[in-house]
Amino acid sequence: MALLITKKCINCDMCEPECPNEAISMGDHIYEINSDKCTECVGHYETPTCQKVCPIPNTIVKDPAHVETEEQLWDKFVLMHHADKI
């Protein structure tokens, strides 16, 4: 499941540089997460770094519109970072 940045976002710029998949970018009003790139940090870290660094609780949550299993997130990570070795 990809993550989603809610309207609680204060545009503090903490999450964007921490994303190892470059899935976070500035949207029209707040930061947004590209669900095609978000692996919830599977393959990189045990927990999503964007959630760790966000100063506002419950601002970055699981996106119910993009449900993925741990295996699907892993496969996405492998395709993005190790496709040349497949």
Curated annotation (Swiss-Prot):
One term of GO molecular function = 4 iron, 4 sulfur cluster binding
Q: Which residues cross the membrane?
A: none
Cofactor binding annotation: Binds 2 [4Fe-4S] cluster.
Keyword terms of this UniProt record: 4Fe-4S, Electron transport, Iron, Iron-sulfur, Metal-binding, Repeat, Transport
| Binding site residues for [4Fe-4S] cluster 2 | C19, C38, C41, C50
In which residues is [4Fe-4S] cluster 1 bound? C9, C12, C15, C54
Xref: Pfam families: Fer4_7
Spell out the Gene3D superfamilies in the cross-references. Answer: 3.30.70.20
Instruction: Describe the location of the 4Fe-4S ferredoxin-type domain by residue ranges.
Output: 1-29, 31-65
What GO terms describe the biological role, i.e. biological process, of this protein?
tRNA wobble base modification
Q: Give the UniProt entry's GO cellular component terms.
A: cytoplasm
Q: Does the keyword Hydrolase apply?
A: no
Q: What cofactors does this protein use?
A: [4Fe-4S] cluster
NCBIfam families registered for this protein in UniProt: di_4Fe-4S_YfhL (NF033683)
Functional description taken from the UniProt entry: Ferredoxins are iron-sulfur proteins that transfer electrons in a wide variety of metabolic reactions.
Q: What is this protein called?
A: Ferredoxin YfhL
Source organism: Escherichia coli (strain K12)
Gene that encodes the chain: yfhL
